[in-house]
Curated annotation (Swiss-Prot):
Name assigned to this protein: Corticostatin-3
Domain of life: Eukaryota
Family of this protein: Belongs to the alpha-defensin family.
Species of the source: Oryctolagus cuniculus (Rabbit)
Physiological role: This peptide has antibiotic, anti-fungi and antiviral activity. It also inhibits corticotropin (ACTH) stimulated corticosterone production.
Chief location of this protein within or outside the cell: secreted
Disulfide bonds: 65-93, 67-82, 72-92
Propeptide feature ranges: 20-62
């Protein structure tokens, strides 16, 4: 019984030491990352004489589109998808 209690105590100390090491590593990684702006929308304007993939999606010339991080605004429709820093987001165009 004493052996079991001793092994349990050693296991708890080892787990606590490992947890402290992981939290320090996470703090170091967070400190190394550059600050990012939360709302970075990318606006796209399609010129009249420019043939592009947007026109193939049904987006007409002269339409302003934006790559949104969340949902499209009420006066916009989703015309496809785009990427911001490697993540896929909706491509929203004004109606």
């Amino acid at each position: 019984m004493r052996t079991l209690a001793l092994l349990a105590a050693i296991l708890l100390v080892a787990l606590q030491a490992q947890a402290e090491h992981v939290s320090v590593s996470i703090d170091e990684v967070v400190d190394q990352q550059p600050p990012q702006a939360e709302d970075q929308d990318v606006a796209i304007y399609v010129k009249e004489h420019e043939s592009s993939a947007l026109e193939a999606l049904g987006v007409k010339a002269g339409v302003v589109c934006a790559c949104r991080r969340a949902l499209c605004l009420p006066r916009e429709r989703r015309a496809g998808f785009c990427r911001i820093r490697g993540r896929i987001h909706p491509l929203c165009c004004r109606r």
